[in-house]
């Protein structure tokens, strides 16, 4: 009986580690996003997004599809480093939906000399070829 209990505890702890490991990887991807943004590197910022025509982005201008369209919209909305400012995220929740999907809710803040901006976001991450990518973004 003791061996069985030890076995169950090992399985449960391994599952917890895997969950926290994936959450840590997703948090790292978001950290990479802010670092790229704060260097003025929109293309680097976009590396966290799924480079696919099915990427879904919902923002102030409505529903947009596709990685290239999303990149173009970011370039149009943030043409220089003054407009980009410094980005920070406050991650409110990271929730595992399955072994391949995580849901993230948070707040974004832009500190800028031309006026600060802030809002909330929810993201759907999918594990694709061993890496976590944003496949849907709703930012307001």
Residue ranges and their predicted role:
Residues 4, 8-48, 69:
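Short, low-complexity N-terminal intrinsically disordered segments enriched in polar/charged residues
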Residues 50, 61, 93, 107-108, ...:
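A mature extracytoplasmic/lumenal domain signature
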Residues 51, 97-98, 128:
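Structural motif
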Residues 69-114:
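Surface-exposed, charged secondary-structure patches
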Residues 54-65, 79-82:
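A short gly/proline-enriched turn/hairpin at secondary-structure junctions
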Residues 33, 45-46, 54-55, 70, ...:
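Hydrophobic pocket/interface hotspot
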Residues 118-140:
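Short beta-strand edge/turn micro-motifs at domain boundaries
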